[in-house]
């Protein structure tokens, strides 16, 4: 008899036909951001690849979505966007991503969308789009305004 516990209870939520859900996160704008937060480790990454585009192309977007949806064997799939700052890709990019999800999803798949953003570029058009498609939006805020503005600054050093 082994001293190792049976791992099957850890994965019992799935079965051979429906394994447990997994979550994939896309960073379509790479490390590009419209802020210059004092504690950010990500901004310096841009300098590591000065000759490479950091924006996801439409061909890459379609391949990513097709592979993401094909690889999920559960009825619920989360399409998650993060950055840098994902809204720098523009609203048209995300509208296209929703179109591509509709094109590639299987009939039984239910899609959930999430986005983590600093919110600087959000406006009424973004709000309408995110609401229409049921996005769960995480908004990055660092506490009270004086604390937030001390750390989350724009490229001119001003609080956001």
Task: Walk through the language-model features, giving the residues of each.
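Canonical Radical SAM [4Fe-4S] cluster-binding loop centered on the CxxxCxxC motif
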Residues: 19-59
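Glycine-/proline-rich flexible loop or hinge segments
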Residues: 47-49, 76-84
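Short glycine-centered, acidic/aromatic-flanked micro-motifs in structured strand/loop junctions
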Residues: 28, 83-84, 117
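Pocket-edge positions in alpha/beta enzyme catalytic cores
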Residues: 52-56, 86, 156-157
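N-terminal [4Fe-4S]-dependent radical SAM core
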Residues: 1-26, 44, 72-74
């Amino acid at each position: 008899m082994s001293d190792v516990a049976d791992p099957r209870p850890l994965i019992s939520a799935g079965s051979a036909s429906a394994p447990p859900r997994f979550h994939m996160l896309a960073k379509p704008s790479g490390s590009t951001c419209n802020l210059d937060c004092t504690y950010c480790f990500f901004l310096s990454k841009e300098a590591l690849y000065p000759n490479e585009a950091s924006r996801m192309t439409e061909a890459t977007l379609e391949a990513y979505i097709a592979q993401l949806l094909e690889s999920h064997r559960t009825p619920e799939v989360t399409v998650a966007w993060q950055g840098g700052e994902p809204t720098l890709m523009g609203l048209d990019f995300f509208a296209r991503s929703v179109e591509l999800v509709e094109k590639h999803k299987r009939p039984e798949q239910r899609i959930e969308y999430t986005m983590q953003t600093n919110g600087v570029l959000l406006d009424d058009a973004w709000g309408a789009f995110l609401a229409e498609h049921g996005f769960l939006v995480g908004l990055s805020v660092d506490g009270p305004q004086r604390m937030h503005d001390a750390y989350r600054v724009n490229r001119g050093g001003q609080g956001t």
